[in-house]
Curated annotation (Swiss-Prot):
One of its GO terms (molecular function) is monosaccharide binding. Keywords: Cytoplasm, Gluconeogenesis, Glycolysis, Isomerase. Pfam families: PGI. Belongs to the GPI family. CDD domains: SIS_PGI_1, SIS_PGI_2. It is an enzyme of class 5 (isomerase). Pathway: Carbohydrate degradation; glycolysis; D-glyceraldehyde 3-phosphate and glycerone phosphate from D-glucose: step 2/4. The gene is PGIC1. InterPro entries: G6P_Isomerase, G6P_Isomerase_C, Phosphoglucose_isomerase_CS, SIS_dom_sf, SIS_PGI_1, SIS_PGI_2. This is Glucose-6-phosphate isomerase, cytosolic 1. It comes from the Eukaryota. Its main location: cytoplasm. One of its GO terms (cellular component) is cytosol.
Amino acid sequence: MASPALISETEAWKDLKAHLEGIKMIHLRELMGDTERCQSMMVEFDNIFLDYSRQQASPDTISKLYKLADAAHLKQKIDRMYNGDHINSTENRSVLHVALRAPRNSAICSDGKNVVPDVWNVLDKIKDFSDRVRNGSWIGATGKELKDVIAVGIGGSFLGPLFVHTALQTDPEASKNARGRELRFLANVDPIDVARNISGLNPETTLVVVVSKTFTTAETMLNARTLREWISSALGPSAVAKHMVAVSTNLPLVEKFGIDPNNAFAFWDWVGGRYSVCSAVGVLPLSLQYGFAVVEKFLQGAHSIDQHFSSAPFEKNIPVLLGLLSVWNVSFLGYPARAILPYSQALEKLAPHIQQVSMESNGKGVSIDGLPLPFESGEIDFGEPGTNGQHSFYQLIHQGRVIPCDFIGIVKSQQPVYLKGEVVNNHDELMSNFFAQPDALAYGKTPEQLKNENVSEHLIPHKTFTGNRPSISILLPTLDAYRIGQLLAIYEHRVAVQGFVWGINSFDQWGVELGKSLATQVRKQLHASRVKGEPVEGFNFSTKTLLTRYLEATSDVPADPSTLLPNI
């Protein structure tokens, strides 16, 4: 029986490899001089404008990328995802985060069952609960309104909701709805994170949302037990039922923990953690802070891109184009990283979230059939809002390693500022940099230009910019809840396109398991050493040395301590 073919074995891949050498000889200065080419590399959907003309690609490159998509059966794979097929083959699961934002009357099936009614049952439950908390009909154990929320989760249970929360904080409608309320996220098992989260909060007015599908995630459950103790020590054990709710499917463990199972909000195996922000994982805490109506607009924005992704032809399909260009940059041009550069402080948590979505999804070394990949896949994602990043790592991007960049601009600021007598307003100053940076990267500055400017000879090498550094520009009209949902879905589907073309499973994450299992061994050793005084055994010399040093330096830690909570 023949082995399954890798995408790199197809004629389309080989054709792009042959095409590569010619493209590498053409500088972006020359490519950008072709107006017809540039016009062909601009796409608009629902007033979202994508300009990918500053990619190291010709129209012929793009045509060949479409052929690569066909060779990878991209359209069929997208359809299979929407049809609920078990495309997460290693875990035998559907991948249906699109169902989380589907309209109530939609039909999206997993294993022959329409899951949309289940989704809306949970959404209706969230709306009812969040409305009651916000209007004061659900109160705490001492009769006070619950104005503060701590969401406890890690990974996808944290990064996505934090991104959306941060983006909504300065939106006029959302910020008005959030007045007098506080939403915090507790993720790290580091006790410092606990201290910072409870600092300044009153247990009487605090609601804790514990997010864990199985209710067994080690870090999350330790943090949840810590906050349970914080509440119980102040208000008594019975207060837990009024001050803690869960996002989980393990109702027996939820009840055992002390949370009423009626106050547990479900999500499903077909929702991956990093794709779960549109489930109760994100919708519950965000609705408590901003009201369900705002969050529903966010879901509608994501759904609009879901429809666009599934129906638009490749040449007009924003996630498909972005995904194919990433494959081109990574696997052919050899650029291992990508900078996500939103020119909006509201999007300061976009890059950390997409870092997880992308790197946990596509950080794989084998195909979906288990074959080692003979080409580079996956990207190292990082980023910072402009203009902060310009004063941080742009030096390397301009004159060091070539790193393709995503520039994201917003036409109308959430919070405009105008000062009389200034040459431009604050947002125009920001956007001046948004428009300038892609050209600086593409065109650079030659030694000849510097000579014409009478730059000293010895400084010319230091002031030369090679240019020819690719980027894309995305221009959004506003940054309200709807547009935030669209931006999220664009990046989610872009990641899926890359994985579909590379032929990998973008929806499992076995790479996180080994470290967790080794941590279990260390945890047992720490307990044995502290409680029984046992020496460190069963580890390599390096780990044994480090562990022994740590235990000796913390020998004053009691083996069976009394409860001690942060005091800050």
